[in-house]
Each structure stands twice: as structure tokens, then as C-alpha cells.
Amino acid sequence: MFPKVDNPLGHQETRTGATRSQRPQAPKATAASSDELSEESWPSSSWTPSPASTTEGQSTSPPCNLIDNEDSIVAKYINRFRQAQPTSREDRQPAGPTSADFWWLQPTADSSGHLAAGAGEPTGRSAVTGPSPTGVSSTSLASAPLQKVKQSLNSWNSSLLDLETLSLQSRAARLLKRSKASLNDASSSSFPISSDGLSPSSVTFNPDSNKSSNPKEPVLGAPGPSQAIPAPRPASSQATLKPEDDILYQWRQRRKLEQSLQGAGDGTWVLPRMPALTTQTPPVSAVNLGSQDTQPNCTAPCGSVAQPPPSQAFYMERPPLSGPSPHIWAPGTHGVLWAPQANPWVSFGMLPTTLLTSTLAPLASFPVPPTSTSTTPAPTPTPQVCIPGPPTSAPPPCASTPASTLPLPDTPQGPAIPELSSSIQPKKVGPKPRRVSTSSHQKTTVPDTTAFEGPCSQLRGALSQVVTARLFPDSPEDTPPSEADFRKVQAIPSQAKVLRPPPESRRGSKTESRKSQVTLPADAGDPQPATAPKASTLLEVQPREFKMSAPRMGAGDPLTIVPPASSHAPSEDLLSQATKLLQAAEDSDGSEFQEDPVLQLLRAQRAELRQQKRWMPSYLSSWTTLKTRDLRLL
């Protein structure tokens, strides 16, 4: 704000009652001081109308200032609106301020603002840093430029303009010009260039300024076309920052490190300083169930966590937690909780600490639901709380998962290794896992773990099996089994002592292979029941095929939960009840809500997809045959 002048010097005004007050005349410039500018900045009279009999004369009383230093901008504009003399738009438009009308934009002869020969504008800060009159200390301002400025200010009513706004605009224009000059040639001046009022991103330097260049070579975008650009000096301190002192460089490095850590592993959680929980035998550390034509593989032994070769492998490792409980990682369609990438890895919760001290530690394999292949179950203990491929809800913390109770490295592992190796034998998947394996591998003894399971774990296991069976059928085609398969399925139950459930639970031969690989407790002598398929039409085969897939110990009825009195009876009862419920639900699928347009559309799409899926293997086989014949001809 410019200080107000209470005592004017020789201002004469003409006041009439009919017209508004006229604008005062500007005083003569006597010296290059800031007081005269401040005199010109504000009205020097009270601006009050006088009677008609008042004649010309000098005001003898001190004027009354209408605007104080504490008044707001709105008050200034109100006073200007009340007291300003109205002018036309043509008079106001060409009278706008320009850079040549302000003395602080003129090049000075000061020693601190000298330029090279022919320079048209200063690139360095002069001693006069702003339009504030209190900071004017230079004696190089002549009276002629000051009078010129005063005359130009008087021509467009300087007292009616907000000089503070004009000064800020001019200062911004000056800084923009200097920033352009600093961008073109950062080291043309012999003193550092100030960048007050500019953002850090706008003050950049030429990276080639440190290199030697021709002094006579013109620089593009220089302020003047005929300027002589001196030889470049070493750049300022901002251009020669070391990497350890550059904040932006450090921030970029940290960001790159964070991105590399987040993207490393492609979904696997790699712990560099935490050893993996594995045993001494490599086949026990991790089992890869794979697809139809793969054999069980194992990951790297303890000490390193390798990338999973397919998406149907699971491994165990120690999480970054304080407790000794390991996490079990198994295949699924969800993302990893600690690394949110779209990959089929699902965490199965933590094991209770009490189970880690057991001497018998069977390694449970979880069903692997690939995109279009069959689920391959394997021996599982009773309290299996798992989340197969479909997007079901995660198990609540009430159910512990003793599916894999590998002892810690400090516990003796002698009796656990033979048990683990024996339980892995029936996990081998042949070229056609849908067929039933030999009866020698069907009976595998596992310890009685029903003491660790509860009703919620049984119910959760049954629900997960139901969703898996309905969403992920066994075979890629929905064709009925052949006659040879029918005889084979009839011969297998007599060898494996299979009990037949009620006749309404009809299943396919693919479900038969899953049930033959289910493990039973040691005291149970007969495996799970199985029946031969009894489908009549092609469309009815597919619903019957996956009524019950992968029945295991711990499967339960959603309505009735039988307490685990023994290791065999609850599972058989629950499986039979679940079979009845699934059969009833499948039978009522087409009869309920027949008028619902959404269900009608979905059922039509399901029938079409089943038909396409049924004919797809024949298309693939014919295409393969044609391609093979063409290759032979070539």
C-alpha cells in the first residue's frame, strides 16, 4: 500500500454545484523521490462538493481521507465508483498500462544490473526490487523518466486505478521475462538469477550449459536478436547438485524401488530374510497338482522361494509376523492379500500354534480349479477349510486350518517325513485323471483330526465343495461315458469296497475318480460311496456329473450338522444329505420361477453354452487332424 499524503502541495481545484468534482492536476516533479509518487497515488483533497459561490482557491484545511490503510479492496472500489469522473470506453481502452510506463521496468545504469553489449532487458535483479516506494534507494533514477511516468499516469486517471494491482501485474510480467531469459541462457550473467515468486518446476536449466560451446554461436530464444552472448560459465548451484543432494532424484529413486517391490514376484510374496517352512525331503515342501497331463512338481528347497511355474501350485512360507504360525498358500481365483495382482493365489489362514507341535504332519493338497480343466482332488484330512476356484467368501477366523501342520525347523522331523511321503503317493496325476486309479493307491491312512474341527468347519467345507462342483465340472465335454468306462466303474467299487448311496444320487464316471482318491481315517476300511452314471439325455448328464465332486471328510449339510462321534459315520451321513439337497435343487432348477425373464435368458444361454461346449472337443480334434495332415504334406 502506498502511504497517503495528508498535506497536498499546490493543488488547485474548481468546485461547482452542478457538476461533479474535477480531477486534480499533477504537481511538478522536483526530485526523484518516493514521496512524489505517493502524492500522485492518492487524491489530495476531500472530494466534497462545495457551494456554488465557492471560487478557485487553495484548500486551507487538511483533506479528509476516505480510505484508510485498513480498508478493504471493496471499499476502495466503492469510493472510486462514487468519486471517479465517467469516461467513455474509447478513452479507457488505449490508456492501459504498458511496460514502458513504469520506471521499475526500465533498464538501469546500476552496476548490479549491467548486461552485455546490446542487451534489451535485464536478466539480473537490480537494486530496486519492487514498486514499493519505501525500498527505493537507487540514485540512478533521473527526473525526466519520472515526469514522463507522471504524465502518462495523469492521462488515464492514475488516482482512480488500483496501483497495487498494477504493480503486482508488472512484477509478474517482469519475472516471466526473466524466467524466459534464464531458460534460454542460464549462465549469461555474472551473478545468480533470482526466481522469487516462481514455482520450482518453472526454473530449469540447460543441461548443456556445463559443456564448452562456441561463444559466438547464437542462442535460440534469446531476449534480443542482436545480442552478443558471452561464453557460458559453470551453471548455478541447482544445476550441479550431487545425486545425494537432489531431492527430486532421491524421490524418483525411492518411487522406483517401491514400484519394483510391488511388482516383484508376479503375485508371490518373497521374503528375503525369512526362511521358508519346508522339510528335508524336496517332494514334501510343495506339491504342484497341475492340469491333466502334468506330474507333481516341487518348488525349491528351504532357503529360497521360487516363482510358481504354473498357476496351480501352492507353497508354504513364513509370513512377516511375530508368531510362529505359517501361512498356507493354495490356488484359487482371488488375489494375494499382500500383493494385489490378478493371480490365482488364495491365502488359507494361519495354523494354530498347538498343531505345530504334533509329530504326525500330513501334507494336504487342495483342489485346483483350472479355467477349463478338471479339478483334481487328493487326500485331505477332515477339517479342510478351503476356498476353491469360485469366488466364495474367505473362511472366518473361527475355523483353524490344520490342513498342513509341518513342524518348525527346531522341532524333530523324524516321524513326520515317512508319513508325508506316504500320503503323497496317491497324488500322482496320470494323463487322464478322470479315470479311477488302481485300488492299491485308494486307501491312505491319515490321523484322526476330527478333534480339531468344529461344526462351522464342516459346514464351510460342504458349501465350498458344492460351489466348486457346480461351477467347475469335471470334464471339458458333456458327453455320456462310453460302455467300457461303465464296466470299469462297475468293477472298481468291488475292489475298493465302495458302498452305494441312495439311487437318487446319480453321478458321472468323472465324479467316481474323485471319490476314489479321497483319504479315510485309519480305522475306516471302506472309502467313500460311488455310483455309476444313469443319465438319459445329453442335457441331463452335465447336471448329474457334478452333483457331488470331491467328497471329503468334513463335508457337512447346510441344514443338519452331525457331531463328530466317530471318524467315519458323520462324513457318510452328511454326504448323503448333501446329495439329496443337491439333487432336489437341480431338479427344481427349471421348474421354479419359469416366468422370470432373467432366469429364462440365463437358462437359454446355459443350454447354448452346454451345446457349444459339447461340440468343442470334436472341433478341436478335427482341426488338429487337418493341421497334422497339412504338415505331413508339406
Curated annotation (Swiss-Prot):
Chief localization: cytoplasm
Compositional bias segments (type: Basic and acidic residues): 503-515
Residue stretches of biased makeup (Low complexity): 40-56, 128-140, 185-202, 368-377
Name of the gene encoding the protein in the UniProt record: Proser3
Transmembrane segments annotated in the record for this chain: none
Biased composition (Polar residues): 15-24, 203-215, 436-448
Organismal lineage: Eukaryota, Metazoa, Chordata, Craniata, Vertebrata
Cellular localisation: Cytoplasm, Cytoskeleton, Microtubule organizing center, Centrosome
GO CC annotation: centrosome; cytoplasm
Organism from which the protein derives: Mus musculus (Mouse)
Region called Disordered, residue ranges: 1-69, 81-142, 185-242, 368-455, 472-534
The keyword Repeat is annotated on this UniProt entry: no
Bias kind Pro residues: ranges: 378-399
InterPro entries: PROSER3 (IPR037646)
Protein name as annotated: Proline and serine-rich protein 3
Residues where Phosphoserine is found: 588
